[in-house]
Amino acid sequence: MTLYQTEQQERVHLQQVISIINDTIHNTDTSVKEHVETLQEYKDYIWSNKDIDPHEIRSMRESILNHFALGESVIDKRRRLGRILDIPYFGRIDFKEKKNGANILPIYIGIHTFYDSQSKMNLIYDWRAPISSMFYDYELGEATYTSPVGEISGDVSLKRQYRIRKGKMEYMIESSLTVHDEILQKELSNNADDKMRNIVTTIQREQNRIIRNEEAHILIIQGVAGSGKTSIALHRIAYLLYTLKEDISSKDILIISPNKVFGDYISNVLPELGEESVPETSMEQILSEVLENKYKYQSFFEQVTELLGKTTQSFIERIKYKSSFDFISQLDKFILFMENNYFKATDVKLTRHITIPSEYIKEQFRRFNRYPMRQRFEAMTDYLLEMMKVQYYFTVTTADRNLLKKEIKKMFAGNNDLQVYKEFFEWIGNPELFKLQKNRILEYTDLAPLAYLHLSLYGNITQCRVKHLLIDEMQDYSPIQYKVIQKLYPCRKTILGDASQSVNPYGSSTAGMIRKAFTMGEVMKLCKSYRSTFEITDFAQKIQTNNELEPIMRHGEFPSVLQFENTEKESSGIIDLISSFKKSGYKSLGIVCKTEAQAKELAESLQTYTAEVYFLSNQSSAFVKGIIVTSSHMAKGLEFDEAIIPVSYTHLRAHETLSDL
């Protein structure tokens, strides 16, 4: 195979590969059409010949099934070809085996293998193929991979990465390390000097340590703003899918993300994942399902909105207490108190002649103390009936079993989760810490402790199907929420976020708090901020300082602070900035307001000027490029090429400063 060395040669090669893919697509389309026509011919023949003998029917059935299977295979091939047409590959290594006479083999790596039947060669190797492992596992120099015939050793003499979109190469880079982040790739592609190359190499080594960490059962990543933590976490998923492909697939991984928009936003970050989508859910959905969707509750978004608006100190105090470890400790003590005080055994008259004495029932309650409270009733019922059967030759019916179970359940004073939860606050002497909203709606901060109490009484509903759990925006979840996650998901976990980016400072968690909640976990820190320019990072540091953040000298324009006399002139200024954005060539502009109500009002105002403005609300389910107006809560975790933050001092409450926004 020809060794393409220059960027121009690589561009020519790319177009040659795309041309061959297009030819293959044309041939595949023809093959699909032929299979459809053949199946239709069989169908027509059967309909027009009613007197077909059984032997011919069996023969035709075999032929139809074969054609159907082949057709499905061809359709699947066509689908894969369609996927690689826009981005045929993203990496290349040149590899030479150690055996004598071996030639250097250029290996192009993409989301699917592509074999050219004309040249009888693999033009693209699947990123999961054994030979592709050297792209991820080795720098330049000696390398090995395990093939079906054994271990192959040799030398990697070249490593390249490409940014290809819609069949066009935007840039390529050469680096001994595999650089995962697009912004770092761009820096290297822009003829970066040795200093920047060293910085990028350092960042990539730090990221690789996280991506390839297979030892930690719980990996907690504390990353400052702009450190690329979300991208790293998703590449970690790709790496785990590759290295553990015999044990884990995409359906075995679950992502907990803050909202539907964020889930959609990250879904296209990894071309390496190919067609494998990873299931996503939210913390609210998990907690509500534990409680069997019985309760109406305030969403996290609604809680944040209330905190940003007019709220009471008592509301804040309720959130703060229920986000503390003292709260968890008291709840555990109360569950133990229930164990000793909520079960009052009574005699049960099973038949006219058989009565089970209360002391015997109480003894069995203690006997089965290894079971959660309500599971214990099942075990007690079965055991007591078995004893009656042995002692009295009693024939047990379903009605007898149901009666005894019902009577035992009545002896327990904790059958109503919500009532028990309310009694807990009376038990600790602070009944005012529990308050239902209008229409008996639970406050968001009560959802997790109620689920925790439910699991403690009913037993864990262990989600064994999930083999790896990824939690993003870790700071937005409280310790009690992590305790529920611990009960539900015993699997390995990757948890990431930034303690300084919480939208609810009263109910947030640091990496240390999360580690304490799980009683284990390895914490890894990312302090280098590179996804924003030095000027933007420096500007943000002046508003709210983060002493752990290390800005990278990637320069750009200084942020502008514009002053307006009133909101009308502010809107006019925003319209001018939108006009400049349209001419800039950038793809996304985020206009971020403090609350959703303010964002909606501004979006409606701007939409009279241009229909291209999109309002991203809590109800939105997809992230779109272009001009987006949204709230600070919804914008968290998203990235924009340009951003506008309208700050009207009429929106600031008396005690607030700019840093609170």
Provide a role label for each language-model segment.
Residues R79, R83, S189, D193, ...:
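Short, charged/polar micro-motifs that form catalytic or ligand-binding hotspots
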